[in-house]
From Swiss-Prot:
Protein name (database record): UPF0229 protein Avin_46880
Organism: Azotobacter vinelandii (strain DJ / ATCC BAA-1303)
InterPro entries: UPF0229
Chain residue ranges for the region called Disordered: 57-108
The organism's taxonomic lineage, starting at the top: Bacteria, Pseudomonadati, Pseudomonadota, Gammaproteobacteria, Pseudomonadales
Residue ranges with Gly residues bias: 92-101
Family: Belongs to the UPF0229 family.
PANTHER family in alphabetical order: UPF0229 PROTEIN YEAH
């Protein structure tokens, strides 16, 4: 009997390298399909894969052939239907690779589009590609990055000083049982048969000798299985885990006042869900502070931020004041990178808009890395937008404002706000 031991390090995903090469080759097609999927999906439905279709003409392999120049003499077979100069009509249907419309035809051929599925992980990778938090720097200077050594499981390769004896012997024992199991079963049967013959047929020397020879052969076969094989060796895997010295916090400020229609609130929630998904996926060490406001502001948890029905009037400065207070109390400026994203419909008590501008310019913007403001309205901008333009003029590198008219604008605006900047 033959035994096969799979020693491939990537046995279960043997096509992973080929798949990654394929994704790199057709990156433009996949990115376009992902952007179209984002525009038609609900933001809460982002953590799923997507079916990608690549036209058949784009998957042709390049070939070498003779150029069309020069003089050639070719003899073509004749026919009874056409004469020189006539045009051959295009088939009306059944040509292959079509959309399926039209009548059936008994002629024509083509290539269907190549359709494949990308995973949830790959979908999010393409979705958040080239995005980052702007101006992320090390605020807490402690010299070089520090690392700590942590256990990271068991490896088949390693330093002999880190060999795991228990796991090695367990693996060797399991291998010996697997490779000698059939021989051991036959050995037990032969011993039982030999005992029976010695009791019932003691004069049957021929069969007894055959069984004794078989028992000897089986024992030698079992003994030939090596006690320890290189495949059995297991080592304690130790890795260096960096201690991050860059810490970041994102303040999410959402207007839930009565002027915000349900559709506007839904767009604001979807924008922040997209932002939250981006932060949690891209950054392991980041705090998120949720602040809802109408006439008064309140710091809430994730559940209440996205699903609470509380509403009221509109005083935007209440949220900015609360953000400034939380910054001072919990996030020392010399240690934390501070970011903020604000969503509103632009409506505000008229006397409050200049207050918002002053709070931003004097108490918030000098201490934050980046502040983004999105105004969700199809109407003309109001006083708050124009006051914020003054803030943008004072802090052009760290303040950005964009308008969202419909749900289709959420993803393009999000990419515009958090597009990776080239180093200058």
């Amino acid at each position: 009997m033959s035994y096969v031991i799979d020693r491939r390090l990537n046995g279960k995903n043997k096509s992973t390298v080929n798949r990654q090469r394929f994704l790199r080759r057709y990156r433009d097609h996949i990115k376009k399909a992902v952007e179209e999927a984002v525009s038609r999906r609900s933001i809460t439905d982002m953590e799923h894969g997507e079916q990608i279709s690549i036209p058949g003409r784009d998957i042709d392999e390049p070939v070498l052939h003779h150029g069309r120049g020069g003089k050639q003499t070719i003899v073509h077979p004749g026919n009874k239907e056409f004469t020189a100069g006539e045009r051959i009509p295009r088939p009306s249907g059944g040509g292959g690779g079509g959309s399926g419309s039209g009548k059936a035809s008994n002629s024509g051929e083509g290539i269907d589009d190549f359709v494949f599925q990308i995973t949830q992980e790959e979908f999010l990778d393409f979705m958040f590609e080239d995005l980052e938090l702007p101006n992320l720097v090390k605020r807490h200077i402690t010299g070089a990055d520090t690392f700590k050594t942590v256990r990271a499981g068991i490896s088949s390769e390693g330093n002999p000083s880190r060999i795991n004896i228990v796991r090695t012997l367990r693996s060797a024992h399991a291998r010996r049982i697997a490779l000698s199991g059939n021989s051991r079963a036959k050995l037990r049967e032969a011993k039982a048969e030999l005992e029976r013959l010695k009791i019932e047929e003691p004069d049957n020397f021929g069969d007894i000798q055959k069984l004794e020879a078989e028992i000897t052969r089986l024992r030698m076969r079992i003994e030939r299985v090596p006690y320890l094989d290189t495949f059995d060796l297991k080592y304690n895997l130790l890795v260096k885990q960096p201690n991050p010295s860059s810490k970041a916090v994102m303040f999410c400020l959402m207007d839930v006042s009565g002027s915000m229609t349900q559709a506007t609130k839904d767009i604001a929630k979807r924008f922040f869900i997209l932002l939250y998904l981006f932060l949690k996926r891209s950054y392991d060490k980041i705090d998120v502070v949720f602040i809802r406001h109408h006439t008064s502001a309140k710091e809430v948890d994730e559940e209440e931020f996205f699903y609470s029905r509380e509403t009221g009037g509109t005083i935007v400065s209440s949220a900015l004041k609360m953000m400034q207070e939380v910054m001072v109390e919990r996030y020392p400026l010399n240690e934390w990178n501070i970011y903020a994203a604000q969503a509103s419909d632009g409506d505000n008590w008229n006397d409050d808009s200049p207050i918002c501008r002053d709070i931003l310019i004097k108490q918030i913007m000098p201490f934050v890395q980046y502040y983004s403001y999105v105004e969700i309205t199809p109407r003309e901008h109001q006083a708050l937008w124009y006051e914020y333009e003054s803030v943008r003029e004072a802090f052009p590198d760290s303040f950005a404002q964009q308008q969202i008219v419909s749900a289709a604008d959420i993803y393009p605006v999000f990419r515009e706000l958090f597009q990776r900047r080239l180093a200058t």
